[in-house]
Amino acid sequence: MTDLPFVSALVQADLPVWEQCLQTEFLQKMENGTLSEGCFKSYLVEDSLYLREYAKIFAWGMTKATTMAAMRTYYSLLSFVQENEDLTRLRYLEEYGLREADIQSLPLRPESRAYLDCMIDAARTGEGEAECLMACLPCMLSYGWLFQKLLQRSPAVKDTYYGALVLDYASPGYDAACRAWAERAEAACTGLSPERAARCRAIFRACSEHELHFWEMCATPRTDI
């Protein structure tokens, strides 16, 4: 039996956590079309605040990169997040009468802050590029997996108010980007010592668990918007 590539093995090991994400109240209600406006609006605000901080992981990645190719990877990640994810999110915010500039002073919720602190600490204190990628990959890869599953199980979700968001993350373009990032991570993790590989696995698992806490949090709307 052939061993799985490092990143594929990480994903396989964490699928039970991602399955739990899929079963959270927020995503279940999104899937069946009963998600409240308050919860969805709160998610959009929290996601906006989260993405601002998430971009800092890529900055740490650039400082740890040892080749121009690696630096371009982080630049492409940042560009993809800003250009691809922003379009739909900003349109939804506009429909709710919210501007991104107006919500930047709002605080992150504790679950988001804990998640971001975990990622930033892993990227800052890690030996190099591998740790940075392990910190940011669970968010990227799990989003693609979750929304593809949502669309496969309930195709009608694409016709709901949340359909544009679901289709963004379930799209072939997003999947191709995730595959490219996973390939870069695979290259960065090739030849790691057993101790460092174990640390990378621990980072990936911790961030997957923070993803679960994030989705659990989203079932309760913010009270400050």
Protein language model annotation of sequence segments:
Residues 173-205:
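Long amphipathic all-alpha helical oligomerization modules
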Residues 1-8, 12, 223-225:
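Basic/polar N-terminal segments that are highly enriched at the extreme N-terminus
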Residues 61-65, 96, 122-126, 150-154, ...:
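Secondary-structure edge/capping motif, primarily at the C-terminal ends of alpha-helices
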Residues 2-6, 115-121, 216, 220:
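Hydrophobic alpha-helical segments
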Residues 69-176, 205, 209:
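Active-site-proximal alpha-helical scaffolds that flank and shape metal-associated catalytic sites
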